């Protein structure tokens, strides 16, 4: 019984990743090249994600900042997801949708990039940070499910995972983020 569940989860993940990376290989390589240039020119990467994607945004930010595979200089990456005090303060004033956008507006400039991680829906905070990033002049990227309703919040770079399963979305998003970090590390530090 356990073996069947394990085999099913592995098969689902393979069915997700194979078409995703075939369809998005050039986009991922282009985004990695953009981030490499951004870091070389003094720009920063800001990461955001709501719900369970906040943890992934935080982890990926740490891997860019500290390291993923080797000892190297820090890369300027900032996760906007871990300020619990600000989240509580804004929620108390019915301004929870400003959690990411307030931080981005205070910290970012037009040399920076925002990477937003989302599931099958965009939260009000997700939508607002995309809008704010565009107003500032940041480059915007989004990793989300293929059926996510974007409406007027279309990012410049869109990577859509072909599933609506939350566990598979989380795993696929984390894998894509790890790959992105590895590509940037490889280009900047020769690994």
Segments the model singles out, each with a brief description of its role:
Residues 34-108:
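Glycine-rich, small/polar surface segments that engage phosphate groups of diverse ligands
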Residues 22-25, 89-95, 119, 137:
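Short, flexible loop segments at the rims of nucleotide/cofactor-binding pockets, characterized by
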Residues 15-22, 26, 33, 37-41, ...:
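Generic secondary-structure signature for well-ordered alpha-helical cores
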Residues 110-111, 116-161:
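C-terminal binding/interaction regions
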Residues 1-23:
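Generic N-terminal amphipathic, Lys/Arg-enriched alpha-helix
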Residues 12, 34, 63, 103, ...:
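Alpha-helical scaffold segments in soluble metabolic enzymes
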Residues 144-191:
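Short alpha-helices
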Residues 56-58, 89, 125-128, 152, ...:
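Short glycine-/acidic-enriched loop or helix-start segments at secondary-structure transitions
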